[in-house]
Amino acid sequence: MTVATEDPADEAAALPGHPQDTYDPEADHECCERVVINISGLRFETQLKTLAQFPETLLGDPKKRMRYFDPLRNEYFFDRNRPSFDAILYYYQSGGRLRRPVNVPLDIFSEEIRFYELGEEAMEMFREDEGYIKEEERPLPENEFQRQVWLLFEYPESSGPARIIAIVSVMVILISIVSFCLETLPIFRDENEDMHGSGMTFHTYSNSTAGYQQSTSFTDPFFIVETLCIIWFSFEFLVRFFACPSKAGFFTNIMNIIDIVAIIPYFITLGTELAEKPEDAQQGQQAMSLAILRVIRLVRVFRIFKLSRHSKGLQILGQTLKASMRELGLLIFFLFIGVILFSSAVYFAEADERDSQFPSIPDAFWWAVVSMTTVGYGDMVPTTIGGKIVGSLCAIAGVLTIALPVPVIVSNFNYFYHRETEGEEQAQYLQVTSCPKIPSSPDLKKSRSASTISKSDYMEIQEGVNNSNEDFREENLKTANCTLANTNYVNITKMLTDV
């Protein structure tokens, strides 16, 4: 007698709701398949399902990582930084946590994040953890003509004509500042300088004749130079305004506010002089108007800050001060406490002295500030033993107070300085990571003409090259075809980044 027995697996599969109803052994095997990654000779092993958690990245996308596959060794080879890959692999294993190894510099780890295409979110998380300050986005106008004009006046490094305009602007600023200083020399001042309002017109009033004389000086050389400078500043400002991508954001930019401050005093002074009537002098209003004009003329000195638009050093200094406002606020607060404390102490220490130089606590504020900042003019000095002890403590406290926030400010300056220098180097250098496809000449011309801003164009060019890399990988997987392409790629990227 023959007894037919069912396979236990079949019986289990026949049960309703059993997990094997949807079980796919091939899919499970594929996800659990191990993959070997060789990083400059150091081999790492992980599972495909670990890498598949982030399919948009270089290692998570099978098509992207295929270009680095070595069929002879059955592994993926990357000639990259080995210590950094520990953190890169942990990013996949932990589900998105990115921690920089202590022995890897910031710039190298940032390059590794970009190479493995972990994405902007991972980069922002890394920068936030490292204390980086988020860079402001600087959009470009959508209109082609406005974009070219905006790049011409706003980005001197974008092209040759833009550099020429920047040089002209710097020369005009310097001429304006030199003229502002020279017109105050005694040899250039009129004998009636006290009645000289703006370098354009001056008025004299004679009591003996009870007459009013007005002498215009529109032919004065300083007025002509000032007018020419204002014409250039106004033209530059209006062109920037009409070509800017955002009219509302244009007036919130500190550089544009400086431009307005540099232009307005001229027109206010000119309008005041032209609108002033002779009878105003008899009514005693001339002195007040001249005082206002002197204050307005003083604002012209802020024109020197226009140089910061063309000076990376001044921009770095401004960014450092902006990032260090909290530390500077603490410094001023500590100095305020010290001034109140030591001015009060030196006043009471010198109170019994007959020839005391500290008649009151407010009078001692100046001495406390000078002593705490270690300037020490010597115009006010304590003479008693108690006053000298207070002065010694004041100087020591000032040194300690000023020294405490300085390292933080220096650290911020180093950060902005290195970020600026690294950005310039990055814009001039593209690292060859694989065998790219040479872009066609029309695309190359378009890349050179459509956008000429170094940093943003660099990112667009790099993205285009990466896309061509994927197309080329599908056509050629053999490494023998890479040598010539790499040579041509270096020449092309050098030509693109020389702008």
UniProtKB/Swiss-Prot annotation:
Main location: membrane
Lipidation (S-palmitoyl cysteine): 244
Reaction catalysis annotation: K(+)(in) = K(+)(out)
A Pfam family this chain is assigned to: Ion_trans
Record membrane topology: Multi-pass membrane protein
Selectivity filter, short sequence motif: residues: 374-379
Subcellular location: Cell membrane; Membrane; Cell projection, Axon; Synapse
GO terms for MF: delayed rectifier potassium channel activity; voltage-gated potassium channel activity
Motif PDZ-binding, residue range(s) on this chain: 497-499
Gene Ontology cellular-component annotations: axon; axon initial segment; axon terminus; dendrite; endoplasmic reticulum membrane; juxtaparanode region of axon; lamellipodium; lamellipodium membrane
Similarity annotation: Belongs to the potassium channel family. A (Shaker) (TC 1.A.1.2) subfamily. Kv1.2/KCNA2 sub-subfamily.
Domain notes: The cytoplasmic N-terminus is important for tetramerization. Interactions between the different subunits modulate the gating characteristics. Besides, the cytoplasmic N-terminal domain mediates interaction with RHOA and thus is required for RHOA-mediated endocytosis.
Protein name per the record: Potassium voltage-gated channel subfamily A member 2
Taxonomy of the source species: Eukaryota, Metazoa, Chordata, Craniata, Vertebrata
